[in-house]
Amino acid sequence: MIDSAFVVLPHDLLWGMPLSALPDDAPQWAVDTLLAGQPVVVRRQAMPAGQVAVGLRGRGREQRYAASMWLTNVYRRVTPEQLIDCPSEHIQDWPALRALRQVRPVMDALERVWGVGGSAGFELASGIAALNQDSDLDLILRTPAPFSRRCAAELVEALAASVCRVDVQLQLDQGAVALREWARPAGRVLLKTASGARLVSDPWHLAEVCA
């Protein structure tokens, strides 16, 4: 088990959620997911100390279930940053995985911490099939320090040549912003925080975010 004081972040994958953490009305597929030993993904939601909001995923896109668990039940954690090394021998070389190998030099050149989320991250971390021919590649870019709109626009342009759509979330200390939104020349963007979402002009401006 991992100490309850350790910090988890949205998009981290966790193993160890017990069946007892599911409410009685949870769908059977969610029960089956835990029985199969599959990980859950950390959600962005404020929780009491020692607990974390998580999401379970089934086989179909419509099978998503929000829940929570105690951190003391976690025995393994995989972060998006640990998944950037896409093995070339992966059993199914989906477009999203080819795109990951293709965009790695672009992402590495930013000299910021980044990682893989979404279906690609889930499959790489767990070995459980989650991707298909039409899957996008979801990336996480850690941006605790400001990332200019100009840099965002340049990154969007650089990623446009990849073999599938690449969606990037800018992860700030106070929430997350979609790269494509921030890459626009001007205008407010949607900042997703643990207490909800709001429109802001500058997501790194704490006075505005907290107002």
Swiss-Prot record:
Catalysed reactions, semicolon-separated: apo-[malonate decarboxylase ACP] + 2'-(5''-triphospho-alpha-D-ribosyl)-3'-dephospho-CoA = holo-[malonate decarboxylase ACP] + diphosphate
Q: What is this enzyme's class at the first EC digit?
A: transferase
Pfam families xref list: MdcG, MdcG_N
Give the highest taxon in the source lineage.
Bacteria
Record: active site? 136, 138
Query: Which GO terms of the molecular function aspect are on file?
Result: nucleotidyltransferase activity
Query: What is the E.C. number?
Result: 2.7.7.66
Q: Which InterPro entries does the entry link to?
A: Holo-ACP_synthase, MdcG_C, MdcG_N
Q: Which UniProt keywords apply?
A: Nucleotidyltransferase, Transferase
Q: Which family does it belong to?
A: Belongs to the MdcG family.
What functional role does this protein have?
A: Transfers 2'-(5-triphosphoribosyl)-3'-dephosphocoenzyme-A to the apo-[acyl-carrier-protein] of the malonate decarboxylase to yield holo-[acyl-carrier-protein].
Protein name, please? Phosphoribosyl-dephospho-CoA transferase
- Higher taxonomy: Bacteria, Pseudomonadati, Pseudomonadota, Gammaproteobacteria, Pseudomonadales
